[in-house]
Structure formats: structure tokens, C-alpha cells
Amino acid sequence: MRRLSRNLVAICSTLALTAGLAACGGGSDEAGDAGDTIVAETAFNLKTIDPHRQFEFTGSTIDNAIYQTALEFEDGDLTKPTDGLCSYEMSEDNKEMTLTLKDEDAKFSNGDPVTADDIVFSFERLQGIKGNPSFFLEGVKVKKVDDKTVTLTSAEPNPALPYILPNSSIGIVNSKVVKENKGTTDENDGAEQFLNENSQGSGPYKVEKYDADSQVVLTANEHYNGPEPKYKRVVLRNVSAETQLTDIQSGQAQVAFDLNADQAKQIDESMGKISSLPSTRSLYIFNNTDEKIGGPAADPNFRKAVMAAIDYDKLTDLAGKGSQRMASLVPNEFVGAVPKDEAPERDLAKAKKLLKKAGYDGEKVPFHYSSDQAVNGVDLAQLAETLQAQLKEADINLDLKPAPSSTQLDGFRSAKQPMGIGTWGADFPDPTNYNVFIPGGDVADRVNWKDDPKLKKLADEAAEAKGDARDAAYAKLFKATTDTAVWIPLVQPVSTIAVGSSITKFVSNADVSFDFAKAE
């Protein structure tokens, strides 16, 4: 997925750069020399831009510019969903949401007005075609009440729903046109190719050209009911991080999404600006609780010794400027995050005392990780080697077990790995997305963590909490989860975006990594 972040308020960078709006170098209107064209570059993770099927970063980035959603997050503040195309109200029991069409002047790219029928069709299509994001509205009954009102009803309390609806995978499409082009609300839907080439949104842009291997071109939606974008054309190109660096330096591109910390340091003020935002990814150590599999890792004292032996400040140095300590797996900007000042601290003396309690005598513990994966610039192989060296200082011996990502993921899912590095990217900015780590959850099953009465009680209390009380209730739950050291939070990496000097103002925040429509 793409967005998310929690804790307080917005992590919003509306940055005014000092450079003028000079034209960029290059020989064609797709190379950055046209004053109304913005060239952005990323290593594509793209399968489709059909909003109800896409679930990858690049597709989400594109659909954010094409489609509007019923609700949205204002200025990147993921703790407070706000009105989008609709306003909303939740019932007292959190089982029913009422959406009221608010933006009655919103129009699709062909000039058709956005209606309640379009909202119902979009939600039901998301559910019915069974694409990757269909789980967002699983179990939700969608009903049109009148021309301005839609209700979403869940069998169980669903307080996360307002945090789910802003996702670009729930973009509102022109139901009439999509139906005319093989669109349905079941698995017989055949509109994907049409939507890849003929977007049907009401956002600031529409698709002009779609090539999942090389580039996607967007042009301004002349019927957009919002401020007219300064850049009428967006060219998103599929290139490596190395090429992105040279293109930003030379002015051939204005936005680069994939530079790591070392590459970002090579952008000086004459070339552009670096925007660093907390990512919504969590890096952690997992410990198998089954003694037959986990060995020492199944012992709470050993796990807590590992947690006390880690030098977390050095991990943030490794992750780069802007990365953060974590007190739980919930990112610091989310509702339910545990305050950073409660994060684990290094204490080697404490670690050695705990090891003595555990009866650990220096035996090697297999430590698994993906050898070919980097998460927001953090190379997991380098992270594993760093942890191995740090834990060695407490006389803990890790036996590194690198494997390709696909192999490692299968191994983790098998629940047969003693220890290792795990990663998690939020699907939506709500703490319920982390319930999978609580005993009985899907991810907890991977470490054979079946039951914990204390956590079950806290989880039940959090599920019953309403409104502002949810923040404290979930923070209490996930602090207690960290205290078990089954999951040891390591670092929250940073998302780095380079913006060329020809752009003098832009918005980049936790919800939308770069807002093309607001760039100047």
C-alpha cells in the first residue's frame, strides 16, 4: 500500500524552495523542459491503475491524482479522517456509517456529475471483483438511501472504517461509463484494461498514456472541481534509483521517489530539496514462542535480554535522517501508537542478568531475514549484520540465515523459524490493522503465539473504546505487546523524496507522498 502515519498531527511538508521556476534541461516535452510538465521517476511497482484492483505503491501514487474518495485526510493528518466527496457520521455502536454527498459540483473527466449511484457502484465493485484491496470493505453492506445518502453497515463495530475510506483503492469511478465498458460488481468484471487506458475519476488528472513497463502520462482533468493544477501534465517514468539521482541533478526530472540516504546527500541546494517523511513501515525482530522451534527465543527472559542488548540509536543512524525509534509496531503517527519516549533502551548489564535467568549459555540461535530486500533504504542484510554485532556484545550469538525474499516469507509463514527480521507496512492508518500481531492473529500464528490472557483482555477493551479513548486503549494494548518481547520494534524508516529546483512549492506528507496538483 502507500500512505499512512500516526501519533499526533500531520507530518506535512509544504515546502517553499528558494530557486526560481527555471526551465529544466532536456530535449523533449517529456524530459522536463516544458513549463507545464512535471517529470517524476520511480522504480515501478505497478500492475494496474484500475483503482479497485491496484494495491501497489506506483498504482496508488497515480490513482491519488486521478480519483477522489468519499473521505480523505487533511494535510497528512492520519489521525482524523475528514470530508472528501462526502461528509460522514458514525452510529453510536460504530456499526453504521452514513455518507452524505457533499461536493455536488464534483465532475468526472467527461463532465458527468458524481452521484450517490457512483459511490455505491464503486464500493460494490471493490467488494465484488475480489481484487487485492477487496478486504477493505469485507462484510460491509452498502445501501443507497436517497440521491445524496449512502449507508455502510457492518455486523460488528467497525470504528476503522473512516480510516479506510480515504484509500485510493476505494476511488470513486463513473459507474455509467465503466458499466458500458464491461464493468460489473462481481468477478465477471472486465473493465480493468479500459480503466488502465481511460481513467474514470473526478480528481485533478486523467490518464493519457499507460505503459506498466516504462511510463504513465497524466493530463489535467478540465472538469475538476478544485484549484487548477499549475502542471497540466505529469510524466511518471520507470527508472532505477541511480538514474533518478542523475536526472534530478541534471534537471531531467523534477521528482525522485526512491533515493536512499546516501544518494539524497548528493543533492545540494542548487539541484533541489529533499523531503524526508516518516514511512508507515515497521521493522522488527520476531521470536518464536514454541520452545521446540524457538529454543532460547521462546524464553521471555532471553527475548527481553535481546531487546535490552540492541543499540537503537545506531539503528536510526543506519536507517537515515528522519527515521524514528519505535515503542511498538504501530508507527508513531498513528492513533494507538505508544509514545517514543517509552521505546526500549540499550542496557547491556540488564541484558546479561536476563540471560542468566534464561539459562542461556551462548549457543547459536538461527536468525532469518531477506537477503535481497531493502525497506525504505534500509538493507535488511546490513541490518541483520548490525544486530549480530550488537548482540554479540551481550554474549548473544546469532547464526545468520539469509534467504531470497520469497523463500524467507514462506519460511516465516511456516511458523518454523526461531528468530528473524520482519517488516510490516500498514494497509490503512488505524491500530486495528495491527491486531494480527496479537495472540490468535494471522501474524502471531507465525511465531506460534496462541494465547495471552492479559493481551486478550486489553484487546477486548480497545475494541470497545470509542472516539478519542481509542488512542489510549490501543497504546496500552501495544505497549503490553512490546513488553512480551515476542516482537521487538527496531526502527521506523523514512521515506525520502527529492524535488528538483524548478519546483518552488510542493506538498508532501504522510498521506500523499507528493501531490502533483499542488506543485508550483
Please give the residue ranges for each predicted region:
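Gly/Pro-rich hinge or "lid" segments in bacterial periplasmic/extracellular proteins
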Residues: 168-226
